[in-house]
Amino acid sequence: MIQTESRLEVADNTGAKSVQCIKVLGGSHRRYASVGDIIKVTIKEAAPRGRVKKGEVYSAVVVRTAKGIRRADGSLVKFDGNAAVLLNAKLEPIGTRIFGPVTRELRNEKFMKIVSLAPEVL
């Protein structure tokens, strides 16, 4: 469950280390985002020679949440922290590598590029 002001780690190689959610997209008063949802983020911490700089605003897709995702069979998939992957204006990933596992739910949300780059799909 990601909401405005939530901090997330970045699961790609764009150079950003930490981002902060500034808006949950999808409705005028939408409060929470889960895995597969698109949010607006600002870069809070970045590597010195990365592709992105601190303070820049990007779209991102949530790939892991500590709250977890409930599957149709009743199982619950949780992670240690919250993570996102940065997207460009066409909603394609900016980075060329994804770190850590991602969930199968991203496949339904039309993020096949992220699923194919990920080292593990849960």
UniProtKB/Swiss-Prot annotation:
Keywords: Ribonucleoprotein, Ribosomal protein, RNA-binding, rRNA-binding. InterPro entries: Ribosomal_uL14, Ribosomal_uL14_bac-type, Ribosomal_uL14_CS, Ribosomal_uL14_sf. It holds the Pfam family Ribosomal_L14. GO terms for biological process: translation. One of its GO terms (molecular function) is structural constituent of ribosome. GO terms for cellular component: cytosolic large ribosomal subunit. Gene3D superfamilies: Ribosomal protein L14 (2.40.150.20). PANTHER family: 50S/60S RIBOSOMAL PROTEIN L14/L23, LARGE RIBOSOMAL SUBUNIT PROTEIN UL14M. Belongs to the universal ribosomal protein uL14 family. HAMAP family: Ribosomal_uL14 (MF_01367). Binds to 23S rRNA. Forms part of two intersubunit bridges in the 70S ribosome. Part of the 50S ribosomal subunit. Forms a cluster with proteins L3 and L19. In the 70S ribosome, L14 and L19 interact and together make contacts with the 16S rRNA in bridges B5 and B8. This is Large ribosomal subunit protein uL14. It comes from Delftia acidovorans (strain DSM 14801 / SPH-1).
